[in-house]
């Protein structure tokens, strides 16, 4: 369903209430839930989790639509009711966006979908062996790094943290430059510089296949900006404020779904290294290890009220 279509449906519903003097029926709620709109900031981990959830949703009779939008726009669209689901709420990095959205009452947090992630600056091991082990080591080696830190897409919370460090002149970074790009462009640049053993410092995180593609050293000492334990993070699932009430069956699925580092690393490897389409990768993973399905589908039905677990297993052929 397009955003215009969603707004049109809501307007039509409002007109019906005014003209008929009746409350919205369960059937209207069900129609609103037919298509579930997810956000993807073009992060491969979120592409992966969206695909895993989407394969399940479609087997249950729903349609998934994925919008490629930045994190700031995601929060705006959640608040406006134009995006239903965001499975990439990395905390505490996105705290300011959550605080602003909660003040407006535009989101609901369904809980953690991934524990024990990390998210901070890293360097290749060949740089680390030259003595770069900490944020505090960067400032004295500006020339070797060309005074650049490579980040992801413009406006991303992590980029904002890096820019805040530079603006404050923290750890000797005064005069450095944040290079905005994208996940893919950042890693391509890291690969190019690695070939010549040129120095680079860039944003890194786990889960991600980059941890297998590069011999990385995560930098210590970034607690004031990225948080303790190398930016140790939990990832949460957010929905628009009224979604779980309006669409309780899908809400139950989203509440049930959780991921592991191994699962996400496998998914991202299939997408990045093997060139698989995300939904094909998700189908492959779930067919090869359907053990998560019982927990994910507990209390969940098909769109028309049938046995959800049986429908998903039948669709996957397991």
How does the language model describe each region?
Residues 118-128, 232-246, 269-270:
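A bilobed periplasmic-binding-protein/Venus flytrap-type ligand-binding module shared by bacterial periplasmic
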Residues 53-60, 142-177:
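Ligand-binding cleft/hinge of the Venus flytrap
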Residues 1-14:
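Bacterial N-terminal signal peptides that target proteins for export
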Residues 27-38, 57-58, 140-146, 296, ...:
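Immediate post-signal peptide segment of exported/extracytoplasmic ligand-binding proteins
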Residues 106-155:
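A conserved helix-loop-strand patch within extracytoplasmic ligand-binding domains
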Residues 34-36, 44-45, 164-195, 201, ...:
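An extracytoplasmic/periplasmic, membrane-proximal ligand-sensing/linker region
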């Amino acid at each position: 369903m397009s955003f215009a279509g969603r707004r049109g449906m809501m307007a039509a519903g409002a007109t019906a209430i005014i003209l008929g003097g009746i409350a919205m029926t369960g059937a209207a709620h069900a129609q609103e839930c037919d298509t579930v709109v997810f956000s993807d900031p073009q992060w491969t981990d979120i592409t992966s989790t969206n695909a895993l959830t989407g394969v399940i949703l479609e087997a249950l009779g729903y349609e998934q639509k994925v919008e490629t939008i930045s994190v700031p726009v995601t929060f705006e669209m959640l608040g406006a009711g134009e995006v239903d689901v965001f499975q990439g709420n990395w905390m505490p990095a996105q705290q300011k966006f959550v605080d602003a959205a909660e003040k407006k009452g535009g989101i609901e947090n369904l809980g953690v979908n991934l524990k024990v992630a990390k998210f901070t600056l890293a360097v290749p091991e060949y740089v680390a062996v030259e003595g770069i082990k900490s944020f505090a080591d960067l400032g004295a080696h500006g020339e070797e790094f060309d005074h650049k830190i490579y980040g992801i897409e413009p406006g991303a919370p992590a980029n904002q943290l890096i820019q805040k460090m530079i603006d404050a002149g923290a750890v000797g970074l005064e005069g450095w430059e944040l290079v905005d790009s994208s996940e893919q462009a950042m890693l391509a640049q890291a690969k190019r510089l690695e070939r010549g053993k040129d120095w680079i410092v860039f944003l890194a995180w786990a889960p991600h296949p980059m941890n297998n593609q590069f011999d990385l050293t995560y930098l210590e000492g970034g607690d004031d900006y990225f948080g303790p334990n190398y930016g140790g993070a939990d990832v949460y699932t957010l929905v628009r404020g009224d979604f779980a009430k309006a669409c309780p069956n899908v809400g139950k699925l989203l509440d049930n779904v959780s991921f592991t580092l191994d699962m996400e690393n496998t998914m991202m490897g299939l997408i990045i290294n093997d060139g698989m389409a995300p939904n094909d990768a998700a189908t492959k993973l779930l067919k090869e290890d359907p053990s998560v399905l019982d927990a994910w589908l507990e209390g969940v039905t098909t769109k028309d009220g049938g046995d959800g677990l049986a429908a998903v297993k039948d669709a996957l052929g397991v």
